[in-house]
């Protein structure tokens, strides 16, 4: 705030001189109030600063408003011709109810960052209090970090990145589900193989058991027949 205060201090004598030439003295008193700080983006087309003033003991005639700019260069007076054309760099609009004056800065650029001071004076009054300046509004125009082309490219890139991340997540979910279903299918196939093998073994054991029983009965029957033949027949004797 040091350099800003210094510029304001250097600017006040020059502004007072201009206001003194505009209005020379009486019993009228003017009070001026301005917003202290205003910050806008470089992408804005225009910005409007307000200047509120009040009067005591002044004639019922419109006062004259003057605007001054104090930047990195020499202080300069703005809109000495009124700046009523909206096509100009600066446009001044006055409203008397309430007592307000507006300065619009068109076609904003970073070079428009400065202190804008509003001065109000009654030209036909001789009192020094009939002219007064505000403390000034510090206008800061922020430069954009990226151009429109770069911002559009970043938006498209972000959209593509979102689509890519979504695709990767979907692929991961599908692979995870397929892997989780794989062991289950293998377990099902293995259980089916085991059950078929068990059934085959049971059938083989049953066939083996039947064959063993048949073969074991056959020698016993042959031995019984031979014994019957060896016994003497009572009828023949």
UniProtKB/Swiss-Prot annotation:
Disulfide bonds join 51-118. Residues 215-229 have a biased composition (Basic and acidic residues). Residues 215-237 are annotated as: Disordered. Residues 30-134 form the Ig-like C2-type domain. The chain crosses the membrane at residues 153-173. It comes from the Eukaryota. It is a single-pass type I membrane protein. Residues 174-237 are cytoplasmic. Residues 28-152 are extracellular. Its main location: membrane. InterPro entries: Ig-like_dom, Ig-like_dom_sf, Ig-like_fold, IGSF6. Ubiquitous with higher expression in immune tissue. GO terms for cellular component: membrane. Residues 1-27 form the signal peptide. Keywords: Disulfide bond, Immunoglobulin domain, Membrane, Signal, Transmembrane, Transmembrane helix. It is found in: Membrane. PANTHER family: IMMUNOGLOBULIN SUPERFAMILY MEMBER 6 (PTHR15297:SF2). This gene is coded entirely within the intron of Mettl9 which is transcribed in the opposite strand of the DNA. This is Immunoglobulin superfamily member 6. The gene is Igsf6.
């Amino acid at each position: 705030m040091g350099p800003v205060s210094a510029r304001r201090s250097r600017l006040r004598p020059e502004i007072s001189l201009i206001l003194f030439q505009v209005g020379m003295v009486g019993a009228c008193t003017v009070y001026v109030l301005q917003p202290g700080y205003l910050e806008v983006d470089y992408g804005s087309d225009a910005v409007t600063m307000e200047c509120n003033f009040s009067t005591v003991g002044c004639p019922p005639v419109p006062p004259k408003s003057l605007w001054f700019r104090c930047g990195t260069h020499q202080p300069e007076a703005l809109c000495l011709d009124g700046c009523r054309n909206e096509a100009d760099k600066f446009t001044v609009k006055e409203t008397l109810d309430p007592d307000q004056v507006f300065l619009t800065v068109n076609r904003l650029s970073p070079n428009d960052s400065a202190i804008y001071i509003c001065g109000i004076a009654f030209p036909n009054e001789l009192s020094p209090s009939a002219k007064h300046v505000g403390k000034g509004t510090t206008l800061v125009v922020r430069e954009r970090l990226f151009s429109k082309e770069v911002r559009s490219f970043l938006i498209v890139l972000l959209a593509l990145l979102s689509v890519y991340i979504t695709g990767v997540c979907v692929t991961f979910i599908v692979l995870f589900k397929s892997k989780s279903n794989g062991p289950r299918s293998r377990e099902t196939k293995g259980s089916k193989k085991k059950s078929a093998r068990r059934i085959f073994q049971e059938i083989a054991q049953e066939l083996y058991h039947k064959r063993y029983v048949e073969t074991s009965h056959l020698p016993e029957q042959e031995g019984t027949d031979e014994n019957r033949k060896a016994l003497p027949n009572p009828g023949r004797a």
